């Protein structure tokens, strides 16, 4: 197994992002579903959001017992939003999780750390449309792999009712999308979900 490989696990294809000893960090190749980040329009962090509860509950339970034994629990740090200082909340022990903003910006889709840590003087919203690594973050729907969609990151946005996301063009929405209420027809902010996990191999 090597970084960049696509492997089958459960009912999805996953991309290998990192390898440490006998474990690999993997993320679904496609957006496997669309869900709000939380089930109430109130300030929340990853530790208490409905999406985390779902991923470590119903989504995790879809795996066979043999597959569950291969999923390694991990303690995730949840840093504050680098630009806005919004609290990332408590550390969490997760079996299934979303990537953090640092994961997406600095580690697993090329290194754009200089853009994350050195915003321009008046830059407040879009991360960086000319980021050369944007294309590496673009994702399509599992149900229609020709349809590009935006997907959630677990880091909070500029306020506690928003969470960071990856735009359809791969750009990092550092200010965040609303965790529940959106401007689309059903009134909900149904962001794409790309679960990640550490897999024993």
Language model features: what each stretch is:
Residues 1-201:
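Collagenous Gly-X-Y triple-helix signature in extracellular proteins
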